């Protein structure tokens, strides 16, 4: 016999498949908790990863294509920076919308709507052409729907898993950040073979295939909270904890996605690399950050999100400050990999903390925190382009963002004691 802690419950289907809502399950005779893979719904976790992965691939698609687009449209450094930053800003704003949709119509339907919009936008851009700077910005807004997938994929996966496995579940689903690797690896080569505009149409093929798999595999978790009034969704913003978590994610995820979008431009402009070589360098950096995201969640489960973030902010600040003075592509690449390892770990660590404090508002908090991360990415990507145009160098942009990581570290030191005293963590969960 199983006993549910809280309001969650088990369902057993005719074929014996066990379905679990977001809860801690204890065996009332042994006190044992289910292992990670047995405690949730693995097909949904896989579907969330695939959906997130391909969405992130197209979200940053303008980054690897930026050198080719800039040459074709004669863009300035500031315009290049803004072009790759707009999808990040649009994604930030749309994440809040998706967070609201998730709690009202469920993550599966929300994801379907968002993916159809992205596929339609890319197909239209491919057929009609992108012939001006304004058109690139309009396309960037459409690609923002792909970035907003964050607020869908994570609740889709996390609602199936108990508190002690939240870091792993959200880390594995969030490993869809690796989609940025696919964009960096393949977009420049495809652009060389077929032209950069054709890449927009080619991207629709894997998006459609994954959407089909998503429809088959993904299931909304039972026992989802009832829809609240619109005003109730913004209740978390009345608490300082929400703003702190948003600020921390603006640094970790903002740094990750801002670099993913900007590094192709950096490597081509700073060191004169070809677009394909710059894509390989970017892919190496992004892969490092994506790989450690689930490890960051698992690390936070083990030692606590606060300790994990402390190390993250220190390493990220040192690495990004070092990039400002890097004189060779090898040194810059090594420092970017180090920075991305730290930032990827931080992404997982922040989302280990979010459900511990806001379990009842996980949908909207995912949207709010993700929105803040998008704002951070927009700032980094746009400021790097502006710094290049005004000073002739990217260095000041990296130094300012390194300083923001130090500010986040100071903030974390200020709130960690209060969090540990006042948050009520589930048994076995560290803060």
Residue ranges and their predicted role:
Residues 62-67, 240-294:
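Extracytoplasmic gate region of multi-pass secondary transporters
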Residues 172-218:
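Helix-loop-helix hairpin linking two adjacent transmembrane segments in secondary transporters
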Residues 134-148, 250, 331-345:
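Hydrophobic core of transmembrane alpha-helices in multi-pass small-molecule transporters
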Residues 303-350:
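C-terminal transmembrane helical hairpin of 12-TM major facilitator-type secondary transporters
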Residues 108-111, 309:
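Primarily marks hydrophobic transmembrane alpha-helices of the MFS/SLC 12-helix fold
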Residues 139-176:
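Cytoplasmic helix-loop-helix junction between adjacent transmembrane helices
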Residues 198-215, 396-414:
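Symmetry-related core transmembrane helices of the 12-TM Major Facilitator Superfamily/SLC fold
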Residues 116-130, 315-327:
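C-terminal ends and interior cores of transmembrane alpha-helices
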């Amino acid at each position: 016999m199983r006993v549910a802690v809280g309001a969650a419950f088990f369902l057993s289907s005719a074929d014996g498949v066990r379905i679990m809502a977001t809860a801690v399950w204890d065996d009332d005779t042994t006190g044992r908790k289910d292992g990670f893979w047995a405690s949730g719904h693995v097909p949904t976790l896989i579907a969330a990863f695939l959906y997130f992965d391909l969405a992130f691939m197209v979200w940053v698609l303008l980054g690897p294509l930026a050198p080719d687009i800039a040459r074709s449209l004669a863009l300035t450094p500031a315009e290049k920076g803004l072009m790759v930053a707009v999808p990040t800003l649009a994604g930030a704003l749309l994440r809040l919308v998706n967070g609201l949709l998730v709690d009202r119509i469920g993550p599966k339907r929300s994801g379907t709507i968002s993916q159809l919009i992205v596929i339609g936008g890319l197909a239209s851009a491919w057929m009609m052409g992108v012939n001006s700077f304004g058109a690139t910005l309009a396309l960037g807004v459409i690609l923002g729907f792909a970035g907003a997938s964050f607020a869908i994929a994570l609740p889709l996966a996390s609602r199936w898993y108990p508190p002690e496995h939240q870091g792993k579940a959200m880390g594995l689903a969030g490993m869809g950040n690796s989609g940025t690797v696919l964009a960096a690896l393949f977009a420049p080569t495809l652009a060389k073979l077929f032209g950069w505009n054709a890449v927009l149409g080619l991207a629709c093929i894997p998006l459609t295939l994954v959407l089909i798999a998503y429809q088959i595999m993904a299931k909304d978790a039972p026992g989802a909270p009832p829809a609240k009034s619109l005003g109730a969704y913004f209740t978390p913003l009345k608490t300082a904890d929400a703003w702190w978590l948003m600020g921390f994610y603006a640094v970790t995820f903002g740094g990750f996605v801002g670099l993913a979008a900007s590094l192709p431009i950096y490597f081509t402009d700073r060191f004169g690399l070809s677009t394909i070589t710059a894509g390989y360098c970017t892919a190496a950096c992004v892969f490092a950050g994506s790989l450690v995201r689930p490890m960051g969640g698992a690390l936070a489960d083990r030692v606590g999100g606060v300790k994990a973030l402390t190390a993250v902010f220190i390493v990220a600040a040192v690495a990004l400050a070092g990039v400002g003075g890097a004189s060779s592509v090898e040194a810059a690449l090594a420092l970017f990999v180090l920075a991305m390892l730290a930032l990827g770990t931080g992404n997982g660590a922040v989302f280990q903390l979010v459900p511990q404090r806001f379990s009842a508002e996980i949908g909207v908090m995912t949207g709010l925190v993700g929105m803040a991360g998008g704002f951070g990415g927009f700032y980094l990507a746009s400021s790097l382009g502006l710094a290049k145009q005004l000073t002739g160098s990217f260095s000041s942009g990296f130094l300012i963002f390194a300083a923001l990581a130090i500010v986040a570290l100071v903030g974390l030191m200020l709130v960690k004691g209060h969090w540990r005293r006042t948050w009520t963590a589930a048994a076995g969960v560290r803060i």
